[in-house]
A protein has these predicted regions:
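Alpha-helical hydrophobic/aromatic positions enriched in membrane-embedded helices and signal peptides
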Residues: 1, 97-98, 128
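Short helix-coil boundary/hinge micro-motifs
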Residues: 1-74, 79, 142-183
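Short alpha-helical basic/polar micro-motif
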Residues: 10, 123-126
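Glycine-rich, histidine-containing beta strand-loop boundary motifs that form or position
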Residues: 18, 93-96
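Histidine-centered nuclease catalytic patch
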Residues: 75, 82, 95-123, 132-148
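Short aromatic-cysteine micro-motif
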Residues: 79-87
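Short cysteine-rich clusters marking metal-coordination/redox-active sites
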Residues: 90-93, 125-128
Length: 183
C-alpha cells in the first residue's frame, strides 16, 4: 500500500504528505504529538526476549511539534496542480481533456502586464489557447467559465495527492473555500 500520511503542524494546519517510512521515523522518535484517523498500515518488527513482536501502527493523519508559521500561504504554481484545480476542463470551451492536450493560459497575457500567478491562469485546451492568442478573453470574444483562485493550504494538499483517504479528505474538505469543488 502506498497511501500517504497527512502531516499537520501542532495547530492542525496541513504541512505535507509523508511516506510510511517518514511517518514511522516520526513515531519512533516520539515526534508525533497527536494523531487522527484510521490506521492505514501496520509495520511489524522483530521479537523481544519475551517473544512479543513489535508492531507500529501508522495513522492516516499525524501532527508534529515545531514552529507554527502565520505567513500567507503561497502554493507553488505548476501545471499539474493547475489542471487538477480546474478538473482537466478547458475554462473557455468547457471540454474535458487529457493532460497532454491542456495548457496554461494567462487570462491577462504576460505581454499585456499580466503575471504568472494563480489568479491570472486557467486551464485551456490547445485550440482555445491558440484562438485566444495574446489577448484578454474580452478582446478574443471568449467567455471564462470560472474565476481563477489561489488554493488554500487544505485545498493545495488535496490537489497534490491523487490518493487522498476518506478520513484525510474529511479533515481537509472541512476547510475548503467555496471555490473548489470535489468530484
Amino acid at each position: 500500500m502506498n497511501a500517504k500520511i497527512l502531516r499537520l503542524n501542532k495547530a492542525g494546519i496541513p504541512v505535507s504528505w509523508l511516506t510510511r517510512e517518514e511517518t514511522a521515523t516520526l513515531l519512533v522518535k516520539d515526534l508525533v504529538i497527536w494523531s487522527l484517523g484510521d490506521t492505514v498500515m501496520e509495520i511489524r518488527g522483530g521479537y523481544n526476549r519475551q517473544g512479543i513482536r513489535s508492531i507500529l501502527r501508522l495513522p492516516s493523519i499525524v501532527a508534529c511539534g515545531g514552529k507554527v508559521h502565520k505567513d500567507n500561504y503561497d502554493p507553488p504554481l505548476e501545471n499539474k496542480f493547475l489542471f487538477r484545480r480546474d478538473k482537466n476542463l478547458c475554462l473557455y470551451c468547457g471540454g474535458e481533456f487529457a493532460w497532454g492536450d491542456l495548457s496554461r493560459d494567462h487570462v491577462i497575457p504576460i505581454s499585456g502586464g499580466g503575471h504568472d500567478i494563480w489568479t491570472n491562469v486557467v486551464t485551456s485546451c490547445r485550440r482555445c489557447n491558440n484562438r485566444k492568442a495574446d489577448r484578454t478573453p474580452d478582446q478574443a470574444n471568449m467567455e471564462l467559465l470560472a474565476v481563477p483562485f489561489v488554493p488554500n493550504q487544505y485545498e493545495f494538499l488535496y490537489l497534490s495527492n491523487h490518493a487522498v483517504l476518506a478520513d484525510q479528505m474529511e479533515f481537509l474538505s472541512a476547510r475548503f473555500s467555496r471555490h473548489i469543488q470535489i468530484s
